[in-house]
Each structure stands twice: as structure tokens, then as C-alpha cells.
């Protein structure tokens, strides 16, 4: 049995590491040929509902790319179906919900979640990975209340989130009832993942950049504080928060009791430090760069890694998820470069 690679856990705490840890959002699936073969036969939900298949997909990038963490293969919509949300993942579109939330009565009809009863396949996958002696920490995750709510209100992906914002401004009773419900189910869902063996949790707030600071502070931040504090009340598990196009919210995020602040590619590590970020930082190569020639990739890698080495407490990642078009050998080469360039 290989010894446990806990580099990412050390980096989060600010402890000395042998190299900068690296993993990639959406590293499990998408660009992997083995995964594409599975998708010819199974849907996303079918894979995530079969622990053996899901564990296999989760483990692949650790073996193929030598990443310093595994991220559980599943969708942020996973906990919504059991509470009464009729959600379907449609190819080329994303999550589509046939019963969007419109009134407080719609929120009241939502049930609570019992992870052991409602999503046993998620917990069984985590346990299976633990039993298989996964040699890196496993990252579990959940969607943030705003991002989950936006899907539930809009009925699917949106560019402007008009219905979501309209509810916030017009019907605070329904909005805050939905926020509180999503916080409650997310705490239970995350705690169950940790109890099953997840050692790090990432909260994806993918669409929160659509809000200005004032609205975030009033409509979202209390729920985020409640969610993160609620998880920490059970287990002091490291929590990463990531959003897209939300650099204007960095100061608000820095106030939250998170351990790691995830940056997209629009904000440099230096800029985040100048804004007073005192957490570990994760990021933040533009995923598009992975489609460029290697000399361009290497130049961008050096720039990001040098900024990370200067501040410490840095986890290398992309500024969003891996594109399906990215070649597996590119990801393997990036991981190798990060490890070698930052070796101490």
C-alpha cells in the first residue's frame, strides 16, 4: 500500500509541502476516453447511481494524471431529486426542472433529505473509494444555495437569472424560505459525505457572479454563513468556495468561515492578495489555455505558480472545469510540470 498523499491538506493549513498540490475541476469524466466509452452506454445519473462505476470514474484521473486529490463524480443536482424536484440532465442543455419554484407553497412541498435513505449510492461510492485505499484525499461537494435556487426557479440554465432576481426582490418570504431549506438539506448532505470518508468539501456557487455586492450581502451571505458554520459544527472539514465571474464578491467570501477561496481566471492571485484574502487560494488557469501550444501553457503555469509560491497556501487548479476537448496527455503534462516546477 502506498503512503497517503496529504499534500493538499497541508497546503490548506499553510504547512510545508514537497510541491504545490494540483487537481482539476471536472477532472473526473469529460476529457477521459474511458469515460466517453461509459457514456455511450450510461447516462450521468446512471453512472452516479452505480457505486462501482462512479468510483472507477472518480479514481481515473488520480491514476492517469497523478493529481493530488480525487473529486467525487456526481452532479450538483443530486440532492434535489429526493426532495421533490423533478430534474433531468439533458445533453447539450444541462439540468432541466419541470416543476420550478414559484411560491412559498412550492417550497413547503419540498421534503428534507435523509442521505442514507435517499442517496445511498453517493455514500457507497465514497466508502468504496476508501476501501480501495485511495491514496489522495477525496473531495466531496455540494451546490451553493443561490446556484441551486437559480436552477429551481428558472427551470434550467439561465443567462440573466431574471426570474431568480425577481423572486428575491418581489417575494422575500419565498426566497428566504427556499434559502433556509437548501441550507438545511445541504448541511445534511455534506455531513453524510464527510462521515462516509470525504476529507475536503467544495461548494460550487457557479452563477453567483450575477449578483452585485449589496444583493449578495443581503440575500445570500446569511445563508452561506449558516451553511458553512452548520457543516463546521459537525466536522472541521476543509471547505473550498468557488464561483465564476465573481471577483467583486471576494471580500464577502473572505469574511465567510471557509478555508480555501477558489479563483476563476479573471482575477490573479496577486490581485486577491491585495484585496486582503487571508485564506488558502485555489486556481486559476483559464481552461481555454489547455487548448493552446505547450509553450503558451508553460508560460501561464509559471506565472500562476510563482504567485502561489510567493504567498504560500496555494492549490493549483483551473479557473473553471476541464473542457471535453482537452487532451488527457495535456492534463498529465500539466500535473507533472506543476509538481516538478514547485518541488522543494
Curated annotation (Swiss-Prot):
Q: What does this protein do?
A: Catalyzes the decarboxylation of four acetate groups of uroporphyrinogen-III to yield coproporphyrinogen-III.
| Keyword vocabulary terms for this entry | Cytoplasm, Decarboxylase, Lyase, Porphyrin biosynthesis
Which residue pairs form cystines in this protein?
A: none
EC class, as a word, reads lyase
Q: Report a single Gene Ontology molecular function.
A: uroporphyrinogen decarboxylase activity
- Reaction catalysed by this enzyme: uroporphyrinogen III + 4 H(+) = coproporphyrinogen III + 4 CO2
Organism per entry: Staphylococcus epidermidis (strain ATCC 35984 / DSM 28319 / BCRC 17069 / CCUG 31568 / BM 3577 / RP62A)
Where is the protein localized?
A: Cytoplasm
Q: Where is this site: Transition state stabilizer?
A: 75
Q: Under which name does UniProt file this protein? A: Uroporphyrinogen decarboxylase
Q: Which InterPro entries match?
A: UROD/MetE-like_sf, Uroporphyrinogen_deCO2ase_HemE, Uroporphyrinogen_deCOase
